[in-house]
Amino acid sequence: AALFIGIAPGYISRSVAGSYDNEAIAIFLLLFTFYLWVRSVRDGSMLFGMLTALSYFYMVAAWGGYVFITNMIPLHALVLVLMGRFSERLYVAYSSFYAIGTLASMQIPFVGFQPVRTSEHMAALGVFGLLQLIALTETVRRYVSSAQFKVLVRASVAILALAAFAALVALTYAGYIAPWTGRFYSLWDTSYAKKHIPIIASVSEHQPPAWSTYFLDLH
């Protein structure tokens, strides 16, 4: 992947040191944040979790594409949980990253309260809550019998899931949480921007490239 991205003209033109565009620093920060995240999960280090948050904060200040990190790291954490790989290391890494990173990102003027008031950021908040619930469950497991634990978990999960879903729907309809933006709908329907947001569709980087572009870029 590094080889291909290193010789792609579209990437080189935007990421060269001293470039005028945001991507000159943002692409590096994007990859560096993911690197620090992997280190924090591997080591279970709060220090690396904090460094991940600081790198994320710099990314937020540099480029609006920070939302990609905001959703990819929670997705990775969720996949680990679904695979049965929840651990104290994951809990420490994600909790330190999310708490510090979110508070830091809210200091950027154009972001403000978006991390708690837009649908684009709800996945990160949801995974944070899920990890707290799992950690609490693991603690309770030590003090109750197996039968009581199963009943308690099933009841708690059902109630909390319904409550969280109802709260999300209610707050969205009430206008407290903004709906998904057009660029996210464009991920599922590539013609969405062309139909509904012409100004976004007019930007060349938002248009799907022709297959010949991949061949020409690498020759």
Regions found by a protein language model. Give the residues of each.
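Membrane-interface anchor segments at the N-terminal boundary of transmembrane helices
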Residues: 212-219
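Aromatic-rich transmembrane-lumenal/periplasmic boundary elements in polytopic membrane proteins
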Residues: 146-211
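Membrane-lumen/periplasm interface segments of specific transmembrane helices
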Residues: 63, 100-115, 162-179
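Membrane-embedded helix bundles of polyisoprenyl
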Residues: 1-82, 94-111
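Perimembrane helix-loop-helix junctions
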Residues: 69-158
